[in-house]
């Protein structure tokens, strides 16, 4: 199992209120070849959430948008909220492990830009709300 599912009850609603199931996920880091993870993400719909919240890092490859939308297909029929993480904007890039031993000059090397606009459109077209600012 690539992803860990934790169930937590948070007693916030007044007594007698209908229970609300919220599914939160983050850091999917999907690529088109991650078949096991795609299947696992599809299984999240069986949890029957009332609301889905994603806090980013959907992508890990420039060709991942269709993969992400396919993996989330059933969840996209449920009300959802999302923000992007840094990995939704730029591909991961190799980082020299010796950089920790060098002086930090404040510059950051970013990977190639990812098609986050396509992901944004795909999620919003299915009714999810973009909470990025």
Question: Where in this protein do the model-derived segments appear?
Answer:
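Catalytic core of the metallo-beta-lactamase
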Residues: 12, 31-35
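N-terminal membrane-anchoring alpha-helices
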Residues: 1-16
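Active-site-proximal beta-strand elements of phosphoester/diester hydrolases
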Residues: 19-29
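Proline/glycine-enriched tight loop/beta-turn segments at coil->beta junctions
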Residues: 16-20, 48
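Histidine-centered divalent metal-coordination motifs
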Residues: 29-31, 87
